[in-house]
Amino acid sequence: MIKFSATLLATLIAASVNAATVDLRIMETTDLHSNMMDFDYYKDTATEKFGLVRTASLINDARNEVKNSVLVDNGDLIQGSPLADYMSAKGLKAGDIHPVYKALNTLDYTVGTLGNHEFNYGLDYLKNALAGAKFPYVNANVIDARTKQPMFTPYLIKDTEVVDKDGKKQTLKIGYIGVVPPQIMGWDKANLSGKVTVNDITETVRKYVPEMREKGADVVVVLAHSGLSADPYKVMAENSVYYLSEIPGVNAIMFGHAHAVFPGKDFADIEGADIAKGTLNGVPAVMPGMWGDHLGVVDLQLSNDSGKWQVTQAKAEARPIYDIANKKSLAAEDSKLVETLKADHDATRQFVSKPIGKSADNMYSYLALVQDDPTVQVVNNAQKAYVEHYIQGDPDLAKLPVLSAAAPFKVGGRKNDPASYVEVEKGQLTFRNAADLYLYPNTLIVVKASGKEVKEWLECSAGQFNQIDPNSTKPQSLINWDGFRTYNFDVIDGVNYQIDVTQPARYDGECQMINANAERIKNLTFNGKPIDPNAMFLVATNNYRAYGGKFAGTGDSHIAFASPDENRSVLAAWIADESKRAGEIHPAADNNWRLAPIAGDKKLDIRFETSPSDKAAAFIKEKGQYPMNKVATDDIGFAIYQVDLSK
């Protein structure tokens, strides 16, 4: 016993002599979507609100504030802007360096992971792109279908030289692991089916963290391209960050995917979230928005007093590049990065400026969430015409009526960007305008759905709206921003219908039934008659919707055919063809849907948010289907309009 005590004492003395404290900063970008420049290619104008060339200034400042730092990217990097479109159209051969990696290499990133949109262009394109990165990538849950092994390096433990508080050099073994939503198997089925499988995010991290610790990792950092939800855990959940914070051995979570900001007030009600400290169940976590509008910063203090490194203090924050309230830039351009990107930036501007046709009228999306809209109409017109031409001569498909489903993609972001609306002016149209009207490189897929399924599809779309109390005169918000993504608000053309917002939603934002007796879709007709529940229809949509299986009438068993063409290319070709045939396109909405009139003797105060611009105000005055008047501006900058649905 005496001998044991002496040994223990010697160990404690040795640990005390070698004790050190290290401050480590982990910085993160996420969901850059190829927005390298502070430039809005859709409007052909500079911006102070996004772009890595501005985030770079925050990165440089954050680095200079501390002795020890690392920088990670959380994915959705190579897709999502006209720069990405330009590179995809140009093609990326072996040896070519994608502009995003010219930028990230210049900023000396430490490690990166993959987002779901990395798979949009196929595995070969992704492989060629990743070859240009001068830093390693990790992903643990995408599995090679042939070898049954991880397709990418699942995790990495990097020996990192740091300086402790006494100025002495120490070595930290920092472990990085990456994960991506399993839903990529549906979203990019054409690119991934038979080539990869994807495992559950939480179980993957739970499996690997002990292994990383056994191999010597002093710190474990999870790069999770996944959002934050407090819903009960489900296997293969898309948004799994909350569950990751409950896994022992995880020291920091750098996340994204949801285009939101954590820590932030939107997440204050989640149990276990400390917005002041930036922690989830005690684990520091950060999600820095999108397009470089924020830099994520996690600060860890580590001590090895016990003989091994342990986190003793932790906090996280998301630093903005722009002060929305005061309309002021908080980050200057990084001139070195601007110069690095100049040639690709100029080429992108040329690429999106190619003329494709003409429009007889303006196309703005200011009212796309409250009435039928020209920006959605032209997409549906193009998709419907494409499918009707495609099925000619097919004895099985040609006899079926064609419908088309499209959603508004630019209607204020996730209620975080009052400038994010489609603004296509009448006159000459370019590829820039087609890309503005259809943001994503989705491919056109056609599903076969029954009349009953079309009705249920629309019922899920109607979850876009909050339930309105017809007996209340208090202000009521019409748009369900928190529980429903606007890109799921499908408008189906080829049928006519009304949406009764006084009824409860039948489905939640994930198309899970929540009120079996509720029905919001009223007066659904096809060719002027009530739709036959048993009649079959072809519905043109995109690969995300068709393969996702979330909406009624979608999923593998419903696929009628998969076209080789992107929806955006279909739209551009339709604009060109119509302009050749008729001189210009006429993008007026056909008003096949509307919000059902709310009867009653009370004057309701129903409100919705949209762009605060004078252009929006003029458009609303001219094109509004219901009486609308502006009553306020919210703290983010959205204009708040009151709408009269009594008629």
Swiss-Prot record:
Residues where substrate binds: 440, 544-550
An example molecular function term from Gene Ontology annotations: 3'-nucleotidase activity
Family matches, as Pfam families: 5_nucleotid_C, Metallophos
Its EC number(s): 3.1.3.6, 3.1.4.16
Localisation: Periplasm
Signal sequence region: 1-19
InterPro entries: 5'-Nucleotdase_C (IPR008334), 5'-Nucleotdase_C_sf (IPR036907), 5'-Nucleotdase_CS (IPR006146), 5_nucleotidase/apyrase (IPR006179), Calcineurin-like_PHP_ApaH (IPR004843), CpdB_N (IPR041827), Cyc_nuc_PDE_nucleotidase (IPR006294), Metallo-depent_PP-like (IPR029052)
Alphabetized UniProt keyword annotations: Hydrolase, Metal-binding, Multifunctional enzyme, Nucleotide-binding, Periplasm, Signal
Enzyme class at the top of the EC tree: hydrolase
Full protein name: 2',3'-cyclic-nucleotide 2'-phosphodiesterase/3'-nucleotidase
Source organism of this protein record: Escherichia coli (strain K12)
